[in-house]
Amino acid sequence: MNHGDHVRLIRDGVLGLTGGEWADLGSGTGAFTLALADLLGPGGSIVSVDRDGDALASQARLLTARFPSASVRCLRADLMDELAIGPMDGIVMANALHFICERELFLTRLTSWIRPGGRFILVEYDSDRGNPWVPHALSWDTWHATAERAGFGETRLIGRVPSRFLGSIYASLSVTSVGPS
């Protein structure tokens, strides 16, 4: 996939928002951080979180070259640690949730990092069959069932692309519950 593919995959999850405070969890070299910076524009701010310092450094160079007005803070951390972020307007997590074996604990933390009514964009392989590179696979059907238990009030599919690994990749948008009305 290229930058245009990344933007198209998450665009519907960001539509209607300009600016705001977002995070990209498990951001790696920043493919979706760049897409988020492109979609949010200069009014947005992004916290890019990954445990690989070299990947974050590479990402910072790309962001400076392609989106010099983007406000991005790189945070080197393990996603299972308490993160000094939030509450955010939205979080993107692309091809990273499948590395987390304690998914329920993590999702409880994740929902606390998002404002009520905030957005969570998940990009994952559409498979429940893992392998060494995708150890805890999470298909769209499994995520859809898991999202409500995790505290999201609404979850919908926003994109899908073919993948040479595990068939396809999906993007979904989940909105955090806003509490009783």
Which residues does each predicted region cover?
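Conserved alpha-helix/loop element of class I SAM-dependent methyltransferases that forms part
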Residues: 1-21, 35
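A short acidic, Gly/Pro-enriched loop at the edge of an enzyme's catalytic core
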Residues: 20, 80-91
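Class I SAM-dependent methyltransferase SAM/SAH-binding core
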Residues: 23, 29-81
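Conserved beta-strand signature within the Rossmann-like core of class I S-adenosyl-L-methionine
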Residues: 117-125
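Short alpha-helix
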Residues: 136-151
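Core SAM-dependent methyltransferase catalytic element
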Residues: 161-181
